[in-house]
Structures are given as structure tokens and as C-alpha cells.
Amino acid sequence: MRHPLVMGNWKLNGSRHMVNELVANLRTELAGVSGCAVAIAPPEMYLDLAKRAAEGSHIHLGAQNVDVNLSGAFTGETSAEMLKDIGAQYIIIGHSERRTYHKESDELIAKKFAVLKEQGLTPVLCIGETEAENEAGKTEEVCARQIDAVLKTQGAAVFEGVVIAYEPVWAIGTGKSATPAQAQAVHKFIRDHIAKADAKIAEQVIIQYGGSVNAGNAAELFTQPDIDGALVGGASLKADAFAVIVKAAEAAKKA
């Protein structure tokens, strides 16, 4: 049985005060939670602060990006070794904001995936279609292409212990969200697509939903059999709202 994971992507938000306050409030709100794994991905410069603030809790540390290089003359980049050294475990790659604003290709994201696996870190591979692709009926085609960039170059075995986050681009930060049935259909397609290469691996892959997940829609999303948690943006910046999502995942997957 898959153990759900809810992860907060703080994006470009935070300050020393905010990190300390938010993590302290999360510790309080999530004190009794055991049926859902929790991770947070603060901005890089606050990773160590967040790690110290979360020490002794069940909150795992994550990061929002990684470089393909381990060291050298690559100004402004952060390596997988550095993230591992500071204690980050769940590393987001392929987020639509990176694909759009930084022109990251499927091939580059696949390289990041490989580097993370080599370092024993957990890739959180974001995939998803734009509004135009959705309206053109290309959702499955796009998701398959983004998965195949890894699957066809590294094989199915590398997906063991990996997290995939399905984030329809049209739903990120827009207030729009796929219906639970729509999200489930895509999640099932993703699992079935990997299962063509290895059914056992596909069954254990955690597939999160992302895209305007909030306290109001989380419970219904998590009742779907192939939705194993959420990658949460804006709602992860408020401890009470984030906790509602975590507890909804715990309750749904216990049922």
C-alpha cells in the first residue's frame, strides 16, 4: 500500500521570521499526524534554517530545484551533493514554472532526475499539460512524453521510490482545479503508462496532484484511488490550511 505524501512548495516566498513561525505552527498543527508523510521545500537560502526549525519532527526537507552538475564553474547553481549535505530529501524537478520561465527541456529534466537518483535523493518529477494542450485533447500525449524522457533513457527501475506530481499548468495558481474524476483519469493513465514497462514499479510510485489544491477540495481529491497526495503551492504558506490538506490525505488513505 502506498503511503501518501503532501509536500509544500513555498516557491519564492519567505523570510527568516516567516520560516521560523511557519515551521513552528506546522509542528503544532501536524503533531498527531502519522498516516501521511509531509515535506516542505523552502527557498534554498532558508533550507538550513527550516531544517533546524523542524528538527525532531516528522517534517521532511525538500528543495525546489537542482543543477545537473556536481561542482565547477556554474555560477548560481546548487548541486545534488549540496542538497544532500544540508539534509534535503525530496527535490522538485520539471515544475512548469521552470519549464516556462527557464526553458527547461524534457531532456534536461531527465538529467536532473538521474543526478538525484545517483545521490540517493527522491525526485519529485512534475508533469502536466498547458490549457491549450488540454483543450486540444493532448493531456495524455504530453504526460507520456514527459515521463518517457526518463523512462526510455533510464528504464523503469529508476522510478522505484520516486514521486510524480501531476500539475495541469492551467490549474497552477489560477484557482482552477481539475475535478477529482479528471485528476484520477490522468493519474491512472500515468500509472498505466509506467506499468507497460514494469507493473510492480508502477504500483508503488507515489503520484501527487498539484494545481490549486486547497482545504476545500483536498478531501474529495484524495478519495480517488490513484491520487497519493499533493504538491501544494499557495496553501502551504499557511500552517492551518496546509494541515487540513495533510489530514485529509491521512483520513482518505486510512479509509
Curated annotation (Swiss-Prot):
Record's subcellular location: Cytoplasm
Pathway where it operates: Carbohydrate biosynthesis; gluconeogenesis; Carbohydrate degradation; glycolysis; D-glyceraldehyde 3-phosphate from glycerone phosphate: step 1/1
UniProt GO MF annotations: triose-phosphate isomerase activity
UniProt keyword list: Cytoplasm, Gluconeogenesis, Glycolysis, Isomerase
GO annotation terms (biological process): gluconeogenesis; glyceraldehyde-3-phosphate biosynthetic process; glycerol catabolic process; glycolytic process
Primary localization class, coarse: cytoplasm
Reaction(s) catalysed by this chain's protein: D-glyceraldehyde 3-phosphate = dihydroxyacetone phosphate
PROSITE patterns according to UniProt: TIM_1, TIM_2
Enzyme Commission no: 5.3.1.1
UniProt-listed InterPro entries: Aldolase_TIM (IPR013785), TIM_sf (IPR035990), TrioseP_Isoase_bac/euk (IPR022896), Triosephosphate_isomerase (IPR000652), Triosephosphate_isomerase_AS (IPR020861)
Catalytic residues (positions): 95 (electrophile), 167 (proton acceptor)
Binding site for substrate: 9-11, 173, 212, 233-234
Superkingdom, taxonomy of origin: Bacteria
EC supergroup of this enzyme: isomerase
GO cellular component annotations of the record: cytosol
Quaternary state and interactors: Homodimer.
UniProt xrefs under PANTHER family: TRIOSEPHOSPHATE ISOMERASE (PTHR21139:SF42)
Protein family according to the UniProt entry: Belongs to the triosephosphate isomerase family.
Function: Involved in the gluconeogenesis. Catalyzes stereospecifically the conversion of dihydroxyacetone phosphate (DHAP) to D-glyceraldehyde-3-phosphate (G3P).
Designated name of the protein: Triosephosphate isomerase
Organism the protein comes from: Klebsiella pneumoniae
Gene transcribed to yield this protein: tpiA
